[in-house]
Amino acid sequence: VAIAVLTVAVLVTGFILWPKSPTNLAEENAQARAQLLQQWKAGEIAVLVRHAERCDRSDNPCLGPADGITRIGSEAAAGVGQGFARLGLQQTDILTSPVTRTVQTAHYMFNSDPQTQEWLATCGTTMRNDVVAHKVAHRNLVLVTHSGCIADFEEQTGLKHAAKDAEYTSALFVRIDGSGQLQVLGIVNAEDWNDLLK
């Protein structure tokens, strides 16, 4: 009996301490949301945004090339862009992967064509350090990238068991302080921006 109780205790403790997927920031209490907004105003935030719906994996009408996004995806990207605009983009650097679907997503999200960066397409074992290296003090950083890159980042920040396929146009928010210390804050899915900013 003692062994069974000990086994259950170990399993429960392991489950509680098991790093899981980031929390949905739109479901946080008002104080947590206010803290996120304060950190955004201070320029302490980096956000990894997954591109919009892929044309080559959907039956929805495409905007153009098959490696781009769908019309529905462009509308979702524009909606997420409105959320970022409500946060304020005056002190925000925006970078995108050079792949067509991320470039199109960034264009519809921000009504501009942000600078492309190859590391946002290749990702891999240096993703966490690359994000920190590109984050300028007192300026937010928005990175339009891919689900595999977001998964690499989550694994390198201790979320080894996070869901591996981020939703289209979902945004992973991270706080990076002046000394490069990183804290994953959570995600905002495309449909949750109004709840986040209420």
Predicted regions and their residues:
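Generic beta-sheet signal
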Residues: 45-46, 137-145
